[in-house]
Amino acid sequence: LSYKYYQPANGSEATDNDRYDAMKAAVENGAKVVVCAGFMQTAALQQAAAQYPDVDFIFIDGSPVTTEDGTALTNVAAIAFQEEQAGYLAGYAAVMDGYTKLGFCGGGGGENPACCRYGYGFVQGADAAAAAKDVQVEINYSWQYGASFSASPELQTMASGWYTNG
């Protein structure tokens, strides 16, 4: 078994074209299976899978991919995580550890399904633990999406305000 890692040009500023070019390079260099991780690969993967029907694509943390007319691309296997379960456990554990003023800031890389699922699970877990302990819990819940996965000054200011206010 051999492999090669192809990274899109422009790092965290990569475009759909950059991602497609990385997939295309992998196929042109003989790849029979291309693994793509993250929802941001969707548009490039849609294009590459349609163009290379004899290549299998594994889409980690993504949804099934279709053509523009809605036809499923059978050479794409989508593997989705259940982030809501991890979020549920985090929310539940926080309340069971005695925290009653919680904050959740979802986002990073723009609006994305993984952060939404995690956030929904977090709130449900905190609610379940609050019911089990018969306590009131306050949750500050924000969907101020940053443009990248790094902490923006705006998000840092928001989180700092949460800490300042308890």
Model region roles, listed by residue range:
Residues 1-166:
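A residue-level marker of the well-folded mature domains of exported/periplasmic proteins
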